[in-house]
Design a protein with these regions (language model features):
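Bacterial N-terminal signal peptides that target proteins for export
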Residues: 1-8
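A generic "folded-domain core" signal
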Residues: 19-160
């Protein structure tokens, strides 16, 4: 029988970038931290995430092979409507994201740092936009465990 913790680990490993060298750094509540060579990331699925193929929404904070540090990105459950704003709310703080298709991200490194700081102390974050069909698209992520997962990923990539 699969317990909640193992289900989260299995789900996040599927949502994370594919590679044979992937290493789980830990699961921290609903957030996981992973390493794949010189890439590291903290990642979570939204509450009530769909398990259907093609609808694997997630939020991640990553460190990459091209020098990215604490880069925030989101995969939406569906493609967003062209021209629709993408808003991220962390408790009472509001951030404007940019993106296209089913992806959204912070505008620059400064915005990444502000979002990560808010995630560290926040309780919940919600990303909202309009889907291509005009329907409201909203994903909510509990932030319990996010700071620890972010730290685990940052430390793992600092060692490379």
């Amino acid at each position: 029988m699969i317990n909640g913790r193992n289900f989260v680990l299995a789900s996040l490993m599927v949502a994370a970038p594919v590679s044979a060298a992937k290493q789980a750094l830990g699961i921290f509540s609903l957030w996981g931290a992973f390493r794949d060579g010189n890439r590291c990331w903290a990642i979570a699925e939204p509450e009530g995430a769909s398990r259907r193929a093609g609808e694997r929404a997630f939020a991640s904070v990553g460190w990459g092979r091209h020098g990215e540090r604490g880069q925030v990105s989101f995969r939406l459950a569906r493609a967003k409507r062209q021209g629709s704003a993408v808003l991220l709310r962390i408790d009472e703080r509001l951030f404007q994201l940019i993106g296209g298709g089913d992806n959204a991200w912070a505008e620059n490194g400064r915005a990444d740092a502000e979002i990560v700081a808010a995630m560290r102390t926040g309780v919940q974050m919600t990303i909202e936009t309009r889907a291509e069909n005009g329907a409201s698209l909203r994903d909510t992520y509990p932030l319990r465990g996010a700071a620890t997962a972010i730290d685990a990923a940052a430390i793992a990539c600092a060692r490379t």
